[in-house]
Design a protein with these regions (language model features):
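Pre-Walker A adenine-sensing motif
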Residues: 1-17
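Hydrophobic positions on the alpha1 helix immediately C-terminal to the Walker A/P-loop
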Residues: 36
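Post-Walker A helix-loop "phosphate-sensing" segment adjacent to the P-loop in P-loop NTPases
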Residues: 42-62
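Conserved nucleotide-sensing/catalytic segment adjacent to the nucleotide-binding pocket
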Residues: 61-123
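Conserved P-loop NTPase motor module
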Residues: 145, 156-226
Length: 226
């Protein structure tokens, strides 16, 4: 049996024991955050479904760019009284930014997040910087995983379990120190068909955002003319 990625094993254990895992995967753009999240999901599907190979698991990997789409999916699970092993919010800061804390949907999502474990064993967020996410999500991110290159030439990245230690200086002042523990090494590469579908879906969301930006700018121009 193939070895699972570290985070995948945590999720499998949570799924089988009615537990819950929350993870924020972050790092510079282009280092393989999304790839790591997808490969974790692949390993989870492979293990839970008892598949022969990990390649078979790619067809079951699910992810979301938008909160409304994800909530529709969770509502369907609730209506059917089902529970799934994970849900992935890719580029989570688009909808779940700390700058949107005052919006009604964020307040409602904050309330529901305490109950989400009933339907999902793990919530995975990807973002360039964890500080961009709403505080209540960062606070509840049990695992913060930083992704960096191990060998850019060979397209090998490493996932580091990120933690902050608190200490006191000789003068009694509090200081923080970041620690990083390597948990996984992986190839930043996805199957062609899966990657093509991901790029297509991502492009659709990019165009939607650009349309929203243009609409906002046009409204501003109209106000300036009045």
């Amino acid at each position: 049996m193939s070895e699972l990625l570290w985070l995948a094993q945590k999720i499998v254990d949570a799924y089988r024991n009615m537990g819950f895992v929350s993870a924020v995967i972050f790092g510079p753009q282009g280092t393989g955050k999304t790839t790591y999240a997808f490969k974790v999901a692949r390993d989870v599907e492979y293990e839970i479904r008892g598949l022969r190979t990990k390649d078979e698991a790619w067809q079951y990997v699910r992810y979301f760019f938008e909160l409304p789409e994800a909530l529709d999916f969770i509502q369907q699970l609730t209506e059917k009284d089902q529970r799934i092993p994970y849900i992935i919010f890719d580029d989570a800061s688009i909808w779940l930014s700390k700058y949107y804390w005052y919006k009604d949907y964020m307040k409602a999502f904050y309330s529901y997040y305490a109950l989400i474990r009933t339907r999902v064993s793990a919530v995975i967020f990807t973002t360039p910087a964890p500080d961009d996410l709403a505080y209540f999500l960062r606070e509840k991110g049990w695992y913060q995983i930083k992704v960096v290159w191990n060998s850019k030439k060979k397209k090998i990245a490493k996932a580091l379990l990120y933690a902050k230690d608190f200490a006191r200086t000789s003068r009694g002042d509090f200081t923080t120190k970041s620690t990083h523990t390597a948990i996984d090494f992986y190839k930043v590469e996805l199957p062609d068909t899966f990657y093509a579908e991901y790029l297509k879906k991502r492009k659709e969301k990019e165009l939607e955002l650009l349309t929203q930006i243009k609409f906002s700018l046009s409204r501003r121009d109209v106000k300036n003319e009045v």
